[in-house]
């Protein structure tokens, strides 16, 4: 199902988290809330868009042949207007996938924000950009 940009814009203007959560519950889609550790860097910003997902895995050894940023950069380069980067770190509190550089790149492509259960770097700069980021820690 494709959701139009117009409908997403209306959702950003009208809907809020409790309405969405209660509606999903009434549809039998229970427990759809973010974990309590994932918090906005700026509680005044709203985030609603199409999810573009990525999964991070811990790397426990150095491998010169492995480009650990290849897929992350490709995902950010492919973001479209209205997209939200959603990066799962599988609850690992040692992974910090998002920062000011990716926020700047995502914003330049028209992306609306980022959600990650991982850590975030460059918090002051991201806040100054007013770029919505929800993260598992800083």
Language model region names:
Residues 1-138:
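Feature captures the catalytic cores and cofactor-binding loops of soluble hydro-lyases/lyases
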